[in-house]
């Protein structure tokens, strides 16, 4: 019985590993979710009451080659293919490599991230803290009309707005950008009185749509006050997709799309209300700096690889 059970588990893991590898080679943006599913099955199977100690030990030996060795091999293969494809077109994979190519002017550039089968336009910040930042969100006072951030799941998935003004780059793209490198998220904030603050989240990661664009990071630093940790390990919520911990929908209540908990200490995709506002927590809020009744003038969210050296670029 033990042998049959082990054989069945081995065959199942081999099948799932093949699926994972196929997605990697195809460049499917959900490949990380598929592989994490393979890995997480160990925990599920461990909970089965009739799983013997012998089967557990053998299953543990299977986990490493399937979820680490094989995945690493095919990830390296696919990465090399994609990099060669991008290099043939002269396109960098993010704004850090745009910087590495000698560009020092902030603006719109074309990049070709790994795991995407097409290039995209992004705004690169080449000035803040040494440059090399790929901007994923911006709020600001750009006059009329004001960009509406009270959007649907599909809109946040694909992105919206104007790269030279207010925009959300898109959860699918953010997923790709945060999975091709280990990155730091920087949030730059400004109020209407001229005050400025920043926050950084190290090892910032957004998972795939299958995992509801769950966000996580390891450590926080900055002078804005920590309004991110409450949202750590939370999935994304919009007015039409409620994934938060509140009995109601945080996005619907606070007029945005965000990694709401129950509900928020930051709401950078809230309503653009220009300073103090009466209705609590519906604006572009950063609670640990200006509270729930002050909507900020500027918010910029940007990412770059952790290994980037300010003023020097990426290690050669």
Curated annotation (Swiss-Prot):
Region forming the signal peptide: 1-27
S-S pairs: 95-124, 250-263
Keywords: Calcium, Disulfide bond, Glycoprotein, Lectin, Metal-binding, Secreted, Signal
Listed GO biological process terms: cell-cell adhesion; fibrinolysis; positive regulation of heterotypic cell-cell adhesion
Residue span(s) of domain Fibrinogen C-terminal: 86-307
Tissue specificity remark: Hemocytes.
Places the protein is found: Secreted
Site residues by UniProt (Implicated in ligand binding): 254, 264, 281
Gene Ontology CC entries for this record: fibrinogen complex
CDD domains: FReD
Entry-linked PROSITE patterns: FIBRINOGEN_C_1, FIBRINOGEN_C_2
Assembly and interaction partners: Tetramer.
Protein name per UniProt: Techylectin-5B
Species, as recorded: Tachypleus tridentatus
């Amino acid at each position: 019985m033990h042998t049959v059970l082990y054989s069945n588990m081995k065959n199942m893991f081999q099948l799932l590993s093949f699926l994972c590898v196929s997605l990697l080679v195809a460049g499917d943006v959900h490949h990380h979710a598929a592989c994490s599913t393979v890995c997480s099955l160990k925990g599920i199977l461990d909970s089965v009451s009739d799983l013997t100690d012998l089967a557990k030990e053998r299953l543990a030996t299977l986990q490493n080659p399937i979820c680490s060795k094989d995945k690493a091999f095919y990830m390296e293969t696919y990465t090399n293919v994609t990099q060669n494809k991008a290099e043939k077109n002269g396109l960098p994979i993010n704004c850090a490599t745009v910087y590495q190519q000698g560009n020092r002017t902030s603006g719109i550039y074309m990049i070709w991230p790994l795991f995407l089968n097409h290039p995209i336009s992004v705004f690169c910040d080449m000035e803040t803290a040494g440059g090399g930042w790929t901007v994923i969100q911006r709020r600001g006072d750009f006059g009329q009309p004001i960009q509406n951030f009270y959007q649907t799941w599909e809109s946040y998935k694909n992105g919206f707005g104007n790269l030279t003004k207010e925009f959300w780059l898109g959860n699918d793209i953010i997923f790709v950008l945060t999975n091709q490198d280990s990155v730091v998220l920087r949030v730059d904030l400004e109020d209407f009185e001229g005050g400025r603050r920043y926050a950084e989240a190290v090892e910032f990661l957004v998972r795939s749509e299958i995992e509801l664009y769950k966000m996580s990071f390891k450590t926080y630093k900055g002078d804005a006050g920590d309004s991110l940790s409450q949202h750590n390990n939370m999935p994304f919520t919009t007015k039409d997709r409620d994934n938060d911990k509140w009995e109601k929908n945080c996005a619907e209540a606070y007029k945005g799309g965000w990694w709401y908990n129950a509900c928020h200490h930051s709401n950078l995709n809230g309503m653009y209300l220009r300073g103090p506002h009466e209705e609590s927590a519906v604006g572009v809020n950063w609670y640990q700096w200006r509270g729930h009744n002050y909507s900020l003038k500027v918010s910029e969210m940007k990412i770059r690889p952790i290994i980037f050296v300010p003023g020097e670029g990426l290690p050669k």
